[in-house]
Amino acid sequence: MNTTIRPAGGLCLPDKCRVTLLALGDVGSTLLMGLRLLGGDVIRSIGICDVRPGVSERWEFELNQIQSPDAAFLPPVDIIAPEQLFDGDVFLFCASRMVPDTSVTSGDVRMAQYGLNRELAAIYARMAREKNYRGLFCVVSDPVDPLCRAAMRESGLAPAQVRGFGLGVMHARALYYARRDGRFASYLTEGRAFGPHGEDLVLANSVAHYDDALSRELTDKVAHANLEMRRLGYKPYVAPALSSGALSLLALLRGQWHYSSVYDGQVFM
């Protein structure tokens, strides 16, 4: 029997979804690995698309050679053309026209990408509209929340169809600091992340015993953790791709509690 789940707003998805993913850069390829390894219970297959020659072929070749000794089901990966991106149930937008180099170690790196990435998101949002798409349009590229709004406006999709995946890593980073600094330990069991992914993030050290000073300090650490990684000379993409991307998306498909951005009538947050 093909049962359905309802992630939001009455939107129905099959018990095992066809997922399509655009762009296999650092984030997209890492997210893809997470879905292939962990998503066998809720994903039936994954279609991948990248405009760069040889990139899709590389990841189809690599990912389909991953298999556990017990031959457990892992979602097969296949290569698709851009016009096939909206033939599935869940579309993942991981594309970016500009990712700041690791030499950029200050400022709002996420919003710096908005102009060019908005144009790119608009192209695929219009494609979704032309295809009369009925599935989920999931934004993973930065800046997540503004791109969600742009995608919804350009596509005419229902608000329940558009989701942003950026807050999961903020929660995960808060847990990281809470484990390392006892002052933030309450976050481990009582903390919550609110607001958009980026500079306007708000972390509550505890929803039961809120401390404004501690919450503000933790928020500042988490909001700028990406810059700490850049100072080490690396782009911060592994934790976002898995915490915000793969793990949060799989939780949504399983009907479980998770962090993702939804539309409140004015903004995505």
Language model features: what each stretch is:
Residues 40-45, 128-136, 156-159:
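Short, surface-exposed connector motifs at secondary-structure boundaries
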Residues 26, 30, 54, 115-119, ...:
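Conserved active-site and cofactor/substrate-binding residues in soluble primary-metabolism enzymes
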Residues 74-134:
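Rossmann-like NAD(P)-binding element
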Residues 32, 57-60, 175, 243-251:
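Predominant activation on well-ordered alpha-helical scaffold segments within soluble catalytic domains
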